[in-house]
Curated annotation (Swiss-Prot):
SMART domains: FYVE (SM00064). One of its GO terms (cellular component) is early endosome membrane. Gene3D superfamilies: Zinc/RING finger domain, C3HC4 (zinc finger). A zinc finger (FYVE-type) spans 904-964. It comes from Drosophila ananassae (Fruit fly). PROSITE patterns: ZF_FYVE. The keyword Phosphoprotein applies. Belongs to the lst-2 family. This is Lateral signaling target protein 2 homolog. The modification Phosphoserine is found at S537, S538, S808. Residues 327-348, 384-393, 401-422, 629-640, 761-770, 812-866 have a biased composition (Low complexity). Residues 423-453 have a biased composition (Acidic residues).
Amino acid sequence: MNGSGGRQMQCGKKADDKSLLARFFHADRSLTAVASELDSFDGRAEPDRCTRLVSKLRLNQDKVLAITNLIMEELLGEDRDPRAFRAKFPEEVLQENLAGQLWFGAECLAAGSSIMNREAESKEMRPLAQAVTKSLGNVRVLLRDQCLRNNVPNSKTLQLDLNDSTTEQLYESLKIFDRLFAEFELSYVSAMVQVKSRHEYEMQQWIGVLFSETLQRALKIGLLDQDMVDAFDPGLMFSIPRLAIVAGLVVYAKGPLNMDMPGDQLSEMFRPFRTILIKIRDLLRNLNHEELYQLEKVLCTNEDINAKAPLGSSSIEAPSPEHSSHHPTTSSNNNNNNGDTTGTTNTHRTVERLVDQRNNNNNNNTSSAPALDKAANRSPSMLSLSPNSTPTASPAPSPTPSHSIASTSSSATGSTHPPADWSDGDDEDEEDDDDDIEVEEEELDSTDDETDEEQLLKDIVAADCASGYLIPNTNLGNLLQPQEVPLTDNFVASEDDEYGAGEQQRQRHRDGQEDEPSTSAAMLAASRTLQRLRLPSSDAEPLAEQSTIKTPEQEQDQPHQSVYRHRHSHRHHHRHHHHHHQRHHHHQHQQPPQPHPHRTTRSGRKRCSLDSTESEATQPERDREPSQASGDTSAASSLSDDVSLAMRNTTARLKFKSTENLLHRLFVCIAGVADQLQTNFASDLRQILRSVFLMNMSSAQEEIDIPEKTKESELFEFRASENDVIQESAGSNQSIYSAEEVNPELDNVFSAGSGGGSPGNGNQANASAQRHSAGGSIQRNNTVDDGSPTGGGALLATSRSHVMRSRSLGDQESASTSTSSSQLHQEQQQLQIQVQRQRNNSVGSNTPSSASSTSSSSEQNSPVSARSGSRRRLQSNNETQMPSSATVTTTATATLAPPAWIPDGKAPRCMSCQTPFTAFRRRHHCRNCGGVFCGVCSNASAPLPKYGLTKAVRVCRECYVREVRSGMSVQGVPSVQERLTATAS
């Protein structure tokens, strides 16, 4: 007992012992003292004292665990439990005091406490927490015993007795504690923050690929600029996620944003928004090329939607020239005159107006059956209308009805590429049909033009279109449902549901009762179905024919083909409806129509392969019809499913009364989802965007910006010659110049100063000589006249050379930025003393205070001293003040480069109080020295004119005290005697 107490006293006396065991002994004793004090009083009675002691307890726990970790590194070595799971942790979790937080959490859980809102996880971790605290207590006892047995003062390594049983017991106890502590770390951190799985990491990589592909596509179509990527434009952090949502839903539909996959397979970043993304996808599929481009442009620029901008009429892009060249009807139709094209264009507007008029009449319950029958007799496009039709929206009547019905109907017929078997030998009917519809248009134009234009203007300036884009406190799901449509998770129906819907659809056709909007929905449905035939597989067509997005130049190459396909598909849509309603209204033909057995099974067009379409395009149509009839019959049910889905998507678009309203809602929802990623997944988004920027930078920029910035002393450094060494009052650290200082062509400041100092005869030769000669600028006995222009130039050259030397040598002499800043201050103070000595010993100066009026530093630019000095010069020697004032003005604008900031990763603790940084104790940089400090040690602010910072900025306390003192002594603050002298004069 006495021996043990003696060893404890002996170990306790040597507090300066730096060995691991001694350091552990003192840290453990301090921790025990704090814990005992905490247990000695009621924390509820003295909350302030309790809080202070708890903070001290956690600091001591950090210290004990840090030393224990060093001991385990030396004793266990490779036997330590692996901690590869830390790669899953977010950046903000991996702090230096993580071990102390884990120990504190384990003690709280072992005592019966629970993590807030994590009761289930706390209950599961409680046995493990109890095992951790018990194992750690055993390790502490064994380490204290080893401190008293085998401690070697100031030993760099542990020198334990390997033959002792206690050493082996310590070894096994450390292994058990290391394993338990690693398990508890993974469990505790996983309960507190989201930890990624392997699948999540893979999905995050796919999200990065999607972002990169989106950026490349945006650069290709002109939405973004390469200079923005090279400059790391902050605006891209918002633009790229928004564009990625659009591209992932409609362009790269089979990528990581494939909404058809199960929800648990989506990335955790987009999993909370799955329902709203499905609705966004369905609406995006109804946009044509121009509308999609306009939406993406708005997502990049946040500009208002241009209501008068021409919107495209096709949601399905025109086929490529190679594909369309196989159709003889298309090539022959390209030779038509402009009158035929004009007639087809008029057909568009006629159908749009009739459909829009039908919807408005049905919505107001004022339409009558005779009126509908009359309209049906006039135009085949109205044969599918019936009093039982129930529209889902009431768009305003207009030539382009607020872009809702017009865009829908024209999108269905604009540039749809029909299969080859759609040419039924009825080309001769088309001219008669066009003439009949043109008559209808002429009758409507005379009465509706003025009313339509006024209504269109009202729709454009509607409140919901002109409102701002940022809508706070908005449910994103409700934004996409302007009508009474419930929001459900089962927005996309399954295959069985779609099949059942198709059967009901066909039954309603047979019964003559149609509930869906007939004309516009059916027209769009068939064209949507045909477009899906062209998109899914890359083996059937070239990539250019599959893409849902093409440049406007590609679509403008084939105007006549698009016009023909518009009219041709329009005829077949009408005949399709005529057949189901048993209303065949044929016009007069030049020859009897050919029989069409395949018309009864027109829904089977989906199964026709594209290869056979191209090969059969050159064959006569009559030879092709019988062979396709059987194939059409076998695939009739498949097309009905797609038709029902397309009609449902079209119905969703019809709920918006204008295209501007639809684009506005899409903007709000897409921007809302993308901006939520900035908040909820900031760390993941930063990593993804950083990778995307690095992958898509230009090669020249990559070579310049990726390497770390090199110090000026490393870039411009050479050995000085004998002429460059200062003769008097100079140290060895002032014998090296920078390359910029030696090169006279780069010395713009000096040239301006010498020119300003001598407006009559600027002596450039003397200025250059004084820049490179030490004797002419700094020697003590050299005489410089106040009125001489070379005197001002010499002082300016002296100031500049000292500033540049201090700047280049400050980084070279010390590794710490704060040390270089203090050396810079000392250099400037020595410069002021030398200038004052030079001015006092000069012949032309009669007053010792003249130096205050010709300061060569921006810190001496005091209005009071300059005014008093100029008055004294006028009274003493009546000399001009222009050289001196020019020198002051010139040097006042010459500022230093701000110091380089110490990286956050190299400063785990405050450089003043040595307090470790945490997620709550943030880092702050001093603008004067570049050091990293906590908020308490850097709560001062002061202007730094030497760096060009005239406003107060954050500085540490040491720099603040130094700047205030130097400002009082260097900046020329007048004394009481000087103020009295200036007042008397």
